[in-house]
Amino acid sequence: MNCFTTLAALLALVLGVGCGKQASSDGESPLGFARDIKGIMSRYCFECHGVEHKEAELDLRTVESILAGGESGAAIVPGKPDESILFEMIHDEQMPPEGKMPGADDIERVRQWIASGAKP
């Protein structure tokens, strides 16, 4: 390869990496509900917003049900964590109302997931 071809290949590689989707904190792939968020919801939310109970008509077990929302409308706005009531409630420590609160890492992971488009 000549110098120009090598430089062009490196530039394409750098631009391709820089334009990728937001990755999870481990840097491997974009955040997804099933892999990165469902466990957090299970630990802190499913008791009141799961199979047996759906407080405020809100089910947090799937991306579809989170987007459908409950009495207050959609729980998230994909790409906009600051406009998402789910993020607001956990960030401001309003939810869960009893028991252990999510840690800063879990809250940030939920924020990143919503910001990256709330993928399944």
Q: PLM ranges: what are they?
A:
Residues 6-16:
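Bacterial N-terminal signal peptides
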Residues 5-6, 62:
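Residue-identity detector for threonine
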